[in-house]
């Protein structure tokens, strides 16, 4: 149980019409009394002067007091809404910190206290940060769904199903003398398969939510003058990169952040890959390889006027040999406006081949759709929820243990092993909502939040 009181600015730092100071903890009522000079009514907005220790006015604004447990954190909470200048906000915080028992809040500590006081679970707490950081309307809607508990409900449904199945399996183990073989009667196998199917559906939705949050990192790579910078400009819809006929124009990494039907896309244009003698260009090429190694997908640009080949191993075997195996690659035959090739995607080719003209924009829409397909992104965020990498990992581990349990049941009727695998799967699901979490995990999650949240 926390005994100290915390304070922080809840609004973004900098100038603004309104700035909000948030206080949470047992001293919140005392802070209100000392700063406003009166005892505040619960959940009642009052326009009052905010006073310094000597009684002089620091600012004027609205004061709101929320007694526990009916507050965001579940503790006594005070909000002071004053003028949003950084100097005014700083003076108010310094004034509040003169009161005994009050200290500055750590990043995410208000949300952490809300979680610890059962005002929200871990996925809802994380959704607050995701909603603040949302880079598109679709991402904001998904984060709001998580904040409202949609993701949590799906996890709780799975956990409840697991609990009921565990009870049935444990009963079969504890009462082997019963005439009916509960493990062989088909109910356990049927219920287990239903849980596996439901978990698969949640994993697919969670993957969509993770894409919405994290986006896709796409690196445009190839030899100099293949049209990489022109493709960056075509995808971003603006002249982000300088385009000339001079090979080696791009010497450093260029980045653009765009959205394709709500899917965040981090596009990176790199220096043309070749054996360069110029020291600056060499550095740019090495940086290009650094980005390629971290990519979700590489767009391998080929100047269609220089070769008829479509296989990257034939076009540039050294590049393919150096490319990490796990990274997907799409071959882009550029300058189709000059070669008169048919535009669009060739599905029978491995890797995928797309013919386009980065200069005119012809065929670029096919590339956009291809990138969505590569990430399994449906573009339908209605009813979807936001997810993080740790959620995907926990769901995957839960699925793995369920499949092990299913194998033990079907192959060996091993009830004890099945029961243990079900228990571990439930534990991994509980990690998502925070019903089973280490202090280290909580520390990592909340430390990534804004101060004041």
Swiss-Prot record:
GO terms for cellular component: cytosol. The keyword Ribosomal protein does not apply. Coiled coil: none annotated. It is found in: Cytoplasm. Its cofactor is K(+). Its EC number is 3.6.-.-. (6S)-5-formyl-5,6,7,8-tetrahydrofolate binds at residues 22, 79, 119, 453. Keywords: Cytoplasm, GTP-binding, Hydrolase, Magnesium, Metal-binding, Nucleotide-binding, Potassium, tRNA processing. Residues 215-376 form the TrmE-type G domain. InterPro entries: G_TrmE, GTP-bd, GTP-bd_TrmE_N, GTPase_MnmE, MnmE_dom2, MnmE_helical, P-loop_NTPase, Small_GTP-bd. K(+) binds at residues 225, 244, 246, 249. GO terms for biological process: tRNA methylation; tRNA wobble uridine modification. Homodimer. Heterotetramer of two MnmE and two MnmG subunits. Exhibits a very high intrinsic GTPase hydrolysis rate. Involved in the addition of a carboxymethylaminomethyl (cmnm) group at the wobble position (U34) of certain tRNAs, forming tRNA-cmnm(5)s(2)U34. Belongs to the TRAFAC class TrmE-Era-EngA-EngB-Septin-like GTPase superfamily. TrmE GTPase family. This is tRNA modification GTPase MnmE.
